[in-house]
Amino acid sequence: MVSLNSVGLSGTKKIADIGALAIHGHRNGWGMLNRHPLLGIEFAAYQKIWRLAGVDQIHVNGIQNKFWESDDSVVRSIEACLKPMFGGFSVLPVVSSGQWGGQAPETYRRTKTTDLLYMAGGGIMAHPGGPANGVLALQQAWEGAVNGLSVEQAASQYPAFAQSVKKFGTK
């Protein structure tokens, strides 16, 4: 993982040029670049710059996130990442911001894709049935989302996900 705004463009490019590892770009500090119209850059342009530097994955925040960014902005960011550049290359959007399975239905409904990395550390590790059930709950949530189920419908069908809803449902 490279903290893009700290390492900078030339540092990120150098890291990408050194090895064959996937470069996971974290945009910590993004808020300072985007929260005021006179200070920054839209994510659609921002992610292109980092793609040119060699980033393979980039954070886009998340639906119903813990920060200030609107869901509409997150959706635009995901769409920008998936738009091919230079012969079909895209960058993998990393959905991460207080994620658990409960955001999967809305994320899928709004983006119509599973071509993303869905980071849910707390949603996995804090699951009442332990981390294995946390992973299972996420799988169940996404299966339900792809099948058009609401959170409530998926919870009634999938026991591990139901436990997540009980624990995280108000978050």
Predicted segments — roles?
Residues 130-171:
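Extended, intrinsically disordered, low-complexity segments
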Residues 1-120, 129-133:
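Catalytic alpha/beta core domains of metabolic enzymes, predominantly
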